[in-house]
């Protein structure tokens, strides 16, 4: 079983978009889209873990510019081939933890990345993303809630409390994927010394975290 999450998303690039087609999630996805478009309107945005560009495409409709990054060339290839009418998205391959852009941005977005960060690495994660944006800048993170009977079951947990799912791709390969599902109180506690004006919206399938630094 493959435990390398980079390999998992490389192999999943061609089928990744299917997660956005689930009928029961459309209302929440539209709500998230509206929040992101409003938050990033006329702003410069750094997007981390942009994947196949689902959110890049939507945010670009209102943002001034997006510097979209991912560690995986396979998903970036899919993202680059989408339509961006304002020609305001720049895609580059970067590892978040070694990413040092020449200029800081006004804001930052990360979709479904929190859940793939190990609990013992969260402090470093927030120090890093906070350092990518200008003072008083805005960060928005979204991720999945665990919905009993709907979400892929958690099949493993390590000594730090990180949880893992066993996922099977269409090619039959099995992958043990890090997927944490934090509660709001945990998130607020983790950010209390690193953020201000914390807003947390908890939906059924997703949560939305917004804060300033």
Show where each model-derived region lies.
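C-terminal alpha-helical "lid/dimerization" subdomain adjacent to the S-adenosyl-L-methionine
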Residues: 144-191
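Class I SAM-dependent methyltransferase SAM/SAH-binding core
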Residues: 52-98
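A conserved beta-strand element that flanks and buttresses the S-adenosyl-L-methionine
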Residues: 109
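Conserved beta-strand signature within the Rossmann-like core of class I S-adenosyl-L-methionine
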Residues: 136-144
């Amino acid at each position: 079983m493959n435990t390398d999450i980079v390999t998992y998303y490389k192999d999943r690039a061609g089928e990744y978009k299917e997660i956005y087609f689930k009928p029961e999630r459309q209302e929440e996805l539209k709500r998230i889209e509206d929040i992101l478009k409003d938050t990033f309107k006329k702003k410069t945005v750094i997007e981390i873990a942009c994947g196949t560009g689902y959110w890049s495409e939507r945010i670009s409709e209102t943002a001034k510019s997006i510097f979209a990054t991912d560690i995986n060339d396979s998903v970036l290839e899919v993202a680059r081939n989408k339509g961006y009418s304002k020609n305001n998205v720049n895609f580059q391959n970067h590892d978040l933890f070694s990413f040092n852009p020449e200029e800081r941005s006004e804001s930052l977005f990360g979709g479904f990345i929190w859940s793939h960060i190990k609990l013992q690495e969260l402090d470093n994660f927030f120090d890093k993303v906070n350092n990518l944006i200008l003072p008083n800048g805005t960060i928005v993170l979204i991720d999945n809630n665990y919905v009993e009977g709907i979400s892929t079951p958690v099949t493993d947990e390590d000594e730090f409390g990180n949880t893992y799912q066993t996922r099977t791709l269409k090619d039959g390969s099995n992958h043990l994927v890090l997927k944490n599902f934090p509660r709001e109180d945990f998130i607020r506690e983790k950010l209390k010394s690193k953020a201000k004006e914390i807003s947390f919206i908890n939906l059924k399938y997703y949560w939305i975290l917004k804060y300033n630094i």
